[in-house]
A protein has these predicted regions:
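Active-site donor-nucleotide binding/catalytic segment of nucleotide-sugar enzymes
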Residues: 8-13, 37
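Acidic/glycine-enriched connector segments
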Residues: 18-96
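Short acidic-hydrophobic, aromatic-tinged amphipathic segments that line or gate anion-handling sites
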Residues: 99-101
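Extreme N-terminal starter segment of soluble prokaryotic enzymes
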Residues: 3-5
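Conserved small/polar residues in nucleotide/adenosyl-binding loops
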Residues: 105-112
């Protein structure tokens, strides 16, 4: 069964491992909702160096291409920053549906209760 792409965005805060944990939880929930999650924060750092200006720009361009190919933009978390606002604005220009936020804290609490 072919699942539509869903671009996952959020305010990514904390250290590298915290961000990876947040993104992994969000992507799992998106997958369980019937989508194929596209989350640049989980993928791009494996081969791009954000400290190199050209690679930083390439990362932004790759992320935008992921969004263009997505059917839905999923905004996760409890906060909105400029990056998330830009993702929402681009999705609107492209006619891509954007969801309401999903709380990482709520998902972790639910996941913990569910696992018991």
């Amino acid at each position: 069964m072919k699942k539509p792409f869903a671009y996952v965005t959020a305010v990514w805060q904390g250290g590298e491992f915290t961000v990876i944990d947040q993104a992994t939880v969000y992507c799992r929930k998106v997958y369980e909702a019937g989508f194929t999650p596209l989350c640049p924060v989980l993928y791009l750092p494996h081969f791009l160096r954000d400290s190199v200006p050209a690679e930083h720009k390439d990362g932004i361009d790759i992320g935008r291409e992921f969004l263009r190919r997505s059917r839905v933009l999923i905004v996760c978390g409890d906060e909105i920053d400029e990056t998330v606002k830009n993702d929402i604005a681009m999705a609107q220009r492209l006619g891509i549906t954007a969801t309401t936020p999903v709380s990482y804290t709520h998902l972790r609490a639910h996941e913990t209760r569910h696992d018991l």
